[in-house]
Design a protein with these regions (language model features):
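Hydrophobic/aromatic residues positioned on beta-strands within the core alpha/beta folds
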Residues: 80-81
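Conserved phosphotransfer microenvironments
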Residues: 52-70
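Conserved acidic carboxylate
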Residues: 9
Length: 134
């Protein structure tokens, strides 16, 4: 059964590229959101993973979006951002952060890891994924 992934990214070309990679890896896209309102409108318990940028069309709302997606919908959240330092020690309930740019092989490793974690499996995280311990 494919994993359903929500992409929260305000730069259209980056969002479309990530969505293409998601499809190429055999997963389903729950759509693209570019701000808090659209992300929460698309959110549901049917979504497994969210890839969330920090700085969006409505400002630096990514951390609040990620926290809400994790707490309210049980979605595994990975931040994909050019500036992971903005996340400090991490965001409650979320898994971690991946620094842009991200290529196909790295995104595949991260998604494989997140899917394994969601299933309760214990595997080592990819080297580029900075995990939050919260």
């Amino acid at each position: 059964m494919p994993t359903t992934i929500l992409i929260v990214e305000d730069e259209f070309l980056i969002a479309v590229e990530i969505e293409a990679v998601v499809h190429d890896l055999g997963h389903e896209s729950a759509g693209i959101a570019d701000d808090m309102e659209s992300a929460l409108a698309k959110a549901s318990e049917a979504i497994d993973v969210a890839l969330v940028d920090v700085n969006l069309a409505d400002g630096a709302t990514g951390p609040r979006i990620g926290e809400k997606l994790a707490a309210d919908f049980g979605i595994e959240v990975i931040f994909v951002t050019t500036n992971p330092a903005q996340l400090g020690e991490g965001v409650s309930g979320t898994l971690g952060a991946l620094e842009k740019p991200v290529d196909l092989s790295i995104l595949k490793q991260v998604l494989d890891y997140v899917i394994a974690v969601r299933k309760g499996e214990k595997i080592d995280p990819p080297a580029r994924l900075r995990l939050f311990f919260n």
